[in-house]
Amino acid sequence: MSSTVISAPLTFDRSKKYRLTAAYFAAFVALGLTTGSLGPTLASLAEQSHVGLSAISYVFTVRSVGYLLGSVRGGKLFDRRPGNPVMAAMLILMSIAMALIPLTSTLWLLLLVMFVLGAAEAGVDVGANTLLGWVHGNRVAPFMNAMHSFFGVGALLAQLSWPRLQD
C-alpha cells in the first residue's frame, strides 16, 4: 500500500500565506483555551461527575494519553491528507468535545470525552506546526514563535474567563 506525502514548503501568494498564518494563530488561541480550561474547572467537574478530587484527577492522564495517540496519528494523517481540511475537522472535534463536557454526568463518560479532546488537541497542535512550516518554509521561525505565543494568549483567557462564567 503506497501513500502520497505532500512536499513542503508549498508556494502561495503573500495574501494567502498571511490568511493561513492568521488561521493557524487562531487555532492556537483555541488550543490554549481548551488546554487552560481544565485546571479552573476541576472542582466543578468532580462535583458534576459525583466523585472526589482524587478520582477526577484521572482526566489529566486520560487526556494526555489521547494527546499522545493523537500526536502519533495526527502526524501520519497530515502527511497523507490535505492539511487544512484535517485541521478544520480537528477543530470541530475539539469544539464538540468541549461542548459535551458539561453534559457528562459520570466519570467514565467524562474520561471518554477527555480522551477524544486530547486527541483532537494533538491534531490541532501537530497540524498547525506542520502546516505553518509548509507555508513559510525556511523562514518559519518568527511565525512559529508567534503562533506559540498565541497559545499563551488562549491559556490566559481561559484563566481569566472562568471566574466570570461561574457567576
Question: Locations of the language-model features?
Answer:
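Conserved MFS/SLC helix-loop-helix module at the cytosolic interface between two early adjacent transmembrane helices
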Residues: L69-W108
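Short hydrophobic/alpha-helical segments at membrane-entry points of transmembrane helices
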Residues: A23-Y24, T106-M114
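Small-residue-rich segments within alpha-helical transmembrane domains of MFS-like 12-TM solute carriers
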Residues: G32, G36, G118-V126, L156
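Cytoplasmic helix-loop-helix junction between adjacent transmembrane helices
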Residues: V113-S149
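Small-residue hotspots at the loop-to-helix junctions and early N-terminal turns
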Residues: A46, H50-S57, N145
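Small-residue (Gly/Pro/Ala) motifs that create kinks and tight helix-helix packing interfaces
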Residues: L42-A43, G74, G154-Q166
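Short hydrophobic/small-residue motifs within alpha-helical transmembrane segments
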Residues: R63-V65, G152-G154
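Extracytoplasmic
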Residues: R19-V51, N129
